[in-house]
Amino acid sequence: RQDIIAGIALYRPGPMDFIPKYLEGKNNRDSVTYDCPQLIPILEPTYGCIVYQEQVMQIVRDLAGYSLGRSDLLRRAMSKKKQAVMEKERQSFVYGNREEGVKGCIKNGISEEIANKIYDEMIDFAKYAFNKSHAAAYGVVAYQTAYLKYYYAAEFMAATLNSYLGNLDKAPQYIDECKRLGIQILKPDINKSFEKFTVEVNKSEAV
């Protein structure tokens, strides 16, 4: 279940860069490294990779002393690519902001170089990242559709083709998929055909 959720969250333009590292860590936990000890409880479940928006929020809270509210504001700024806000927050993340009650990484024993490296990774990651609940919701849909395709392949493919009627790019791809699955595509029949794709069960399933 967690693999499905992580797979969906990783397959995005920002987190996608972490896929090789994630797979290597999953297959060989000894290869997983962390830039500082404070990251271990946050990133251990995802093999040292930032996968979810919630992890960004936890990183800035645990490493730099952000409040819950401020960590969410940073998450929003990153996702909306607000460059001025992100650069201002970099200063707070690395060096702290006494007036606003942010300790900063350096006071927590994290070097300036490592703090900036972590912040750069968070910016690259957060541009198109999902929160975990969002990825989980998509995961449920993926699980359900995989079940339907496996156990009710003809019905599933008929419904899929109906959703792409008139789409000259997608429909041929799904017709090829029917052939790969061993499902016949029948020609129109004035005595049997309907307005849309339907399933005909005879000696073998056909659409």
Spans of model-derived segments:
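Noncatalytic, beta-rich nucleic-acid-contacting surfaces in large DNA/RNA-processing enzymes
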Residues: 1-207
